[in-house]
UniProtKB/Swiss-Prot annotation:
One of its GO terms (molecular function) is methylthioribulose 1-phosphate dehydratase activity. Belongs to the aldolase class II family. MtnB subfamily. PANTHER family: METHYLTHIORIBULOSE-1-PHOSPHATE DEHYDRATASE (PTHR10640:SF7). This is Probable methylthioribulose-1-phosphate dehydratase. The keyword Zinc applies. Its cofactor is Zn(2+).
């Protein structure tokens, strides 16, 4: 009798050819998690991980010798989930891989007819301008909702919330504190992802502290030094967005400094 994986091949989302922490195994597994969070439904969203490919070495006559003498340095590879597919069903073989010069070095089997994500150029900006190790493009409904709270706003602001401590400050290279005023740029949506490149780059330049960019009526891009950090930051943002929406419903400004905050806590904080 055939096992479940033979009856439904899409359930096989792990390849024994690669380590557990390799992007070919991580990306399908995490895409399924992000789908369950509502970030990747309807084939939306995108995900990428930077991976340091280590050239193999062998021990010979008590000296370490690289197998590949033509390139003596470790190489960075960038793995991307494909576009327009059921993200919860992605397989290890379905990924696109680019080198540090943004040249495609591997792609899915041709018979699958998978497409490269239009998010790739934006991902590469996060890699090159922020030193990211992973980037999530989420279609979170909370990110969309906070972009609509004030449709003239070019920023989302929130302060004095514990989960702000889960957000990395790209300028100070430290995590934010509870009393910090967290500011995230909001850019306008466009018909095609390619049209977002210029405003996205401007947001990165104008907001050196941010680890995310919100796209109005669309979603957000969020990054971190590792996939673990990126995932945790994205979850923290989602919590804060939801919280801000609920606060607005009861007439509380998420960006307002509380009257009863201890003065010592707020020394040096933005007002």
């Amino acid at each position: 009798m055939a096992d479940e994986s033979q009856k439904t091949p899409w359930l096989v989302q792990y390849s024994s050819k690669y380590p557990n922490e390799h992007p070919r195994n991580l990306i399908p597994a995490l895409c399924r998690e992000f789908y369950n969070l509502g970030w990747f439904t309807g084939t939306g969203g995108a995900f990428t991980i930077k991976y340091r490919y280590k050239i193999g070495i062998t021990k010979k006559r008590n000296h370490w010798k690289r197998r590949n003498q033509r390139n003596r340095r470790n190489q960075d590879e960038y793995y991307f989930a494909p576009s327009g597919v059921q993200k919860e069903r992605i397989q290890p073989e379905d990924l696109f891989i680019h080198d540090s010069e943004d040249k495609e070095i591997a792609h899915p089997p041709p018979e699958k007819k998978l497409k490269r994500s239009q998010c790739v150029p934006l991902f590469m900006f996060a890699y090159s301008m922020r030193g990211a190790g992973a980037v999530i493009h989420s279609h979170s409904k909370y990110a969309v909702m906070v972009s609509l709270l004030d449709q003239e706003a070019t920023e989302f602001r929130i302060t004095h919330q514990q989960m702000i401590k889960g957000i990395f400050n790209s300028k100070s290279h430290m995590y934010h504190n509870f009393h910090d005023l967290l500011v995230i740029p909001i850019i306008e949506n466009a018909p095609d992802e390619a049209d977002l490149q210029e405003p996205f780059v401007e947001a990165l330049k104008n907001y050196p502290e941010t680890s995310a960019v919100i796209i109005r009526r669309h979603g957000l891009y969020v990054w971190g030094k590792t996939w673990q950090e990126t995932k945790a930051i994205a979850e923290s943002y989602d919590y804060l967005f939801d919280l801000a929406i609920q606060m607005r419903k009861i007439g509380i400004d998420p960006a307002a400094k509380p009257k009863r905050c201890h003065l010592k806590c707020c020394q040096g904080a933005e007002s």
